[in-house]
């Protein structure tokens, strides 16, 4: 009997440990909205995260967004970590030691290649500058918008031909001078 009690006590201890471990690791749960964002920020830390998996990752499941996976289905830690961005250091390791071996770059190495004397770019630029000098936008010369141009021209002509009903003088009338009788003492 004593051995049976020890085995039973050992089984109860193991069962308690197993239940505690399952609760600690947790089963998959659903996360939505702010809870999902907070959890992603906690899991990913400074790396940041994506709402859809980046291209090139090992996709076991069909590429769904994290909202569909975690809000409508169950979500666990491993799944959350697949949506974390890669750290900057792992993508490109530019430590001070690796930069020491690089030669100094000067401005001449970044100059644009020179265009030919009569390249298409120069012809296009000359045509556009000629259009601007003539002050006629290309949209008004287009056949499709010609009716709009004619309407604008008619409106301008109507404004030029409009005459006001009353013509106001361009100068103010002279101020009336006060007569000496009006300015004298009044009794």
From Swiss-Prot:
Region (C): 52-64
Residue span of region A: 64-85
Domain of life: Eukaryota
Region annotation B: where it falls in the sequence: 25-51
UniProt keyword ATP-binding, yes or no: no
Gene3D superfamilies according to UniProt: Insulin-like
Molecular-function GO terms, alphabetical: growth factor activity; hormone activity; insulin-like growth factor receptor binding; integrin binding; protein serine/threonine kinase activator activity
Site (described: Important for interaction with integrin): 47, 57, 60-61
Intracellular or extracellular location(s): Secreted
Protein's UniProt keywords contain Ribonucleoprotein: no
Gene Ontology BP terms: negative regulation of muscle cell differentiation; positive regulation of activated T cell proliferation; positive regulation of cell division; positive regulation of cell population proliferation; positive regulation of insulin receptor signaling pathway; positive regulation of MAPK cascade; positive regulation of transcription by RNA polymerase II; positive regulation of vascular endothelial cell proliferation
UniProtKB keywords: Disulfide bond, Growth factor, Mitogen, Secreted, Signal
Matches recorded under SMART domains: IlGF (SM00078)
Annotated S-S bridges: 32-71, 44-84, 70-75
Renumbered residue ranges of the record's region D: 86-91
Region (Disordered): 162-187
Membrane-crossing segments per the record: none
GO cellular component terms attached to this protein's record: extracellular space
Extent of the signal sequence: 1-23
Family, similarity comment: Belongs to the insulin family.
Function comment: The insulin-like growth factors, isolated from plasma, are structurally and functionally related to insulin but have a much higher growth-promoting activity. Acts as a ligand for integrin which is required for IGF2 signaling.
Protein name: Insulin-like growth factor 2
Organism for this UniProt entry: Gallus gallus (Chicken)
Phylogenetic lineage: Eukaryota, Metazoa, Chordata, Craniata, Vertebrata
Protein's gene: IGF2
